[in-house]
Amino acid sequence: SETDILVVYVDGLQFGKYHVICAVGVDAGGHKHVLGFREGATENAEVATALLEDLTARGLSPFRRRLFVIDGSKALRKAIDQVFGKENPVQRCRNHKLRNVLGHLPKDQHDQAKSTIKAAFKLGADEGIAKLKQYASWLERDRPSAAASLLDGLDELFTINRLGLPSQLRRCLGTTNLIDNSHSAVRQRSARVKHWRDGTMALRWTAASFAASEQNFRRIMGHQHLWMLKAALDEFQQDQQLAQQIKAG
């Protein structure tokens, strides 16, 4: 494809007991593009890898540096390195992280956790990470599972901060809401479905609903700042190519 996809969102949707992984791209102009689907969960390494390999087979170059925005799946994270290389920046979904942490805390601690974590996300990467490590140390005493959840993949919660992107763009690139919002459209279209017969049925409904929704896609919030992301990705790719040339002699 000649479309310059800068961002790839990948997240899983659930229909009854069946799962579908979805990939949506954002080009340099902020326009969204449905890239592909695969039946299965993001936690399934084989399924995650197959989806990404299918994207490259259909024209998404594995040599262009991109920002990947994903849920917290370790299998999906590994698949990105395997298919597209370890040099691509990866942003873990902040909403997934927040929900996971809250799941380990009693309700009377939810407000404090939300305000602390969200405040840290507004800081520079190093300062924000330090704040959350400090909070995790406090949680460790009585809620070790919450502390462990918070610290898991902590650095990749701040990838967009390290890239120096403005807050308006970070709000869109910090979560997989872009896919979650499309999932709402899928749920609306499939509201009358009372029984999901199999994974193939879930996959077909997802593809049809996304295809219909794609016609009404709007550009992402903060799209006017995407040139900054493109510049950072291009610079990183040039530096890497230069390093490889020097190494090759």
Model-derived segments and spans:
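Short, well-ordered secondary-structure micro-motifs
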Residues: 79-80, 105, 161-162
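Acidic/histidine-rich catalytic cores and adjacent linkers
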Residues: 122-249
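RNase H-like nuclease fold core
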Residues: 1-70, 74-86, 178-179
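Amphipathic alpha-helical transducer elements in NTP-driven molecular machines
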Residues: 3, 42-49, 62, 70-77, ...
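A broad detector of the eukaryotic-type serine/threonine protein kinase catalytic domain
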Residues: 39, 53-56, 60, 118, ...
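Inter-helix linker motif
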Residues: 85-103
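Conserved phosphate-handling catalytic cores of large alpha/beta enzymes
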Residues: 98-127
